[in-house]
UniProtKB/Swiss-Prot annotation:
GO biological process: camera-type eye development; lens development in camera-type eye; negative regulation of cytokine production; negative regulation of ERK1 and ERK2 cascade; negative regulation of phosphatidylinositol 3-kinase/protein kinase B signal transduction; negative regulation of TOR signaling; phagocytosis; positive regulation of anoikis
SMART domains: XTALbg
Complexes and interactors: Homo/heterodimer, or complexes of higher-order. The structure of beta-crystallin oligomers seems to be stabilized through interactions between the N-terminal arms. Interacts with CRYBA1.
One Pfam family recorded for the sequence: Crystall
Chain spans, region Connecting peptide: 118-123
Post-translational modification: Specific cleavages in the N-terminal arm occur during lens maturation and give rise to several truncated forms. The initiator methionine for isoform A1 is removed. The new N-terminal amino acid is then N-acetylated.
UniProt note: domains: Has a two-domain beta-structure, folded into four very similar Greek key motifs.
Superkingdom assignment: Eukaryota
Protein name (Swiss-Prot/TrEMBL): Beta-crystallin A3
MF term (GO), any: identical protein binding
Record PROSITE patterns: CRYSTALLIN_BETA_GAMMA
Residues of the Beta/gamma crystallin 'Greek key' domain: 31-70, 71-117, 124-165, 166-214
Record PTM N-acetylmethionine, positions in chain: 1
Amino acid sequence: METQTVQRELETLPTTKMAQTNPMPGSMGPWKITIYDQENFQGKRMEFTSSCPNVSERSFDNVRSLKVECGAWIGYEHTSFCGQQFILERGEYPRWDAWSGSNAYHIERLMSFRPICSANHKESKITIFEKENFIGRQWEICDDYPSLQAMGWFNNEVGSMKIQCGAWVCYQYPGYRGYQYILECDHHGGDYKHWREWGTHAQTSQIQSIRRIQQ
């Protein structure tokens, strides 16, 4: 049975909206995010406890600041969960560069977002493979690595990955920089057999740092 979630538009005279969507059927995860249409938590704002595929359907032309109060979320550059991905963990993000951070790409748009249901910082495991389709040398990872090469991985590319537990964010460059790829054990069955499955924005198999997502 689906659980009703509440999305409240918080303006001078607040209104309440009900939604029948749920991040995962039968799930009662503690997710809550507040978005604003201006930087520094100004202007119109709205709370969400479930996915939003298009903020323009909620009368937002863009998300310019946000607060994550519960859970971990993925923000997307475009509607329908497409484009660049941005990991959104608990905290305040007063401007676009707070969530794109050291992305090294100037992207000020955030048009859709959803909760990460499988994030489990204490119990996370991923296996990376040298080649596509889980072929070649492999390495099981259960911790955060700001530089895979410094810890023993032999090159700057990863061909495929299996997520056994939790959710991970992989980065194009060392030090958690560059494109972000959020990989979850409950998506693709946890199997990412080709780098193109990492996201609609994926353009390369280059992965040089990786960390667990905080719930």
